């Protein structure tokens, strides 16, 4: 069952496909596009009704009524996943399948269970069969996690295919990041592999407008430069519970038993 994961997923991963602007009705001439538009419109209506229902239940709860039932938070889009998947299969291997596959990948990835599995399968179809499509940059962060989704060997093969075959520079940049993220995360910062990985990623980023990915890369670099194993930790000064000043550097070379509490 999908509860708050659905709502959280929207914030974490960006707006789902069903919230994207739709093409004007007069532009949707072919049957595949018309079918897609009808499904998206139906999903929109279901989402709007769900939002109103949950809002009403929440208002009643705040006024002293019963708590919102757990199943009220279930995604209204779970039932649409199989329908979009079926439509994609009807156009398998053709460009007409791409919008359906992207909808499933973006909408189902924040879900759990069958929704997420369908999203992964759709993502795989997009980055393999349809890797030459120029519109895959809409998948954004998913393109940089090929190893996470499909394992080391297959994930690297898929990313390499995107880097070679995609006509979209942003997609190729995400693929470069996917291929090098392991080295950036785990290799020693003074190793040739780390240096080469960082150089390749920065070169790819310099040619495109992907500010969030660029910031993520530089944040990783900064964190590892300051906090890698063997580095000297930044000094910290403070006042203890007895009002005495102390600094972290005073304890260098000593064995310290730390007993602490925190309130976050």
Question: Can you say where each PLM-predicted feature lies in the sequence?
Answer:
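Bacterial N-terminal signal peptides
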Residues: 1-17
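N-terminal leader/linker segments that initiate helical-solenoid repeat arrays
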Residues: 22-78
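Specific register positions within alpha-helical solenoid repeats of the TPR/Sel1-like families, i.e.
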Residues: 47-48, 105-113, 143-148, 179-188, ...
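Alpha-helical adaptor scaffolds
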Residues: 69, 102-164
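Generic helix N-cap/helix-start motif at coil->alpha-helix transitions
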Residues: 80, 93-99, 116-120, 131-142, ...
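Amphipathic alpha-helical scaffolding segments comprising HEAT/armadillo-like alpha-solenoid repeats
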Residues: 81, 114-124, 152-160, 188, ...
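N-proximal helix/coil linker or "cap" segments that precede and/or mark the start of modular domains
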Residues: 185, 189-252
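Short active-site neighborhood of thiol/selenol oxidoreductases, capturing the structured segment around
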Residues: 246-264
């Amino acid at each position: 069952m999908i509860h708050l994961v659905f709502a959280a997923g929207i914030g974490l991963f960006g707006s789902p496909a069903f919230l994207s602007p739709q093409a004007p009705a007069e532009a949707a001439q072919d049957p595949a596009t018309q079918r897609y538009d009808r499904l998206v419109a139906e999903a929109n209506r279901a989402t709007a009704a769900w939002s109103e229902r949950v809002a009403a239940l929440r208002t009643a709860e705040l006024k002293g009524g019963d708590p919102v039932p757990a199943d009220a938070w279930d995604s209204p889009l779970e039932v649409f996943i199989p329908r979009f998947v079926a439509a994609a299969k009807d156009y398998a291997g053709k460009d007409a399948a791409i919008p359906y596959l992207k909808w499933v990948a973006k909408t189902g990835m924040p879900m759990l269970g069958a929704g997420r599995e369908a999203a992964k399968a759709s993502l795989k179809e997009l980055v393999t069969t349809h890797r030459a499509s120029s519109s895959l940059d809409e998948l954004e962060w998913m393109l940089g996690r090929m190893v996470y989704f499909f394992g080391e060997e297959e994930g690297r093969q898929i990313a390499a295919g995107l880097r070679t075959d995609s006509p979209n520079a942003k997609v190729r940049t995400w693929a470069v990041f996917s291929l090098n993220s392991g080295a950036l995360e785990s290799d020693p910062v003074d190793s040739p592999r780390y240096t080469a990985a960082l150089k390749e990623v920065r070169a790819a980023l310099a040619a495109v407008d992907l500010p969030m990915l660029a910031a993520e890369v530089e944040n990783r670099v900064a964190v590892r430069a300051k906090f890698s194993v063997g580095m000297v930790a930044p000094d910290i000064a403070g006042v203890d519970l007895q009002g005495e000043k102390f600094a972290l550097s005073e304890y260098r070379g000593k064995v310290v038993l730390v007993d602490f509490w925190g309130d976050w």
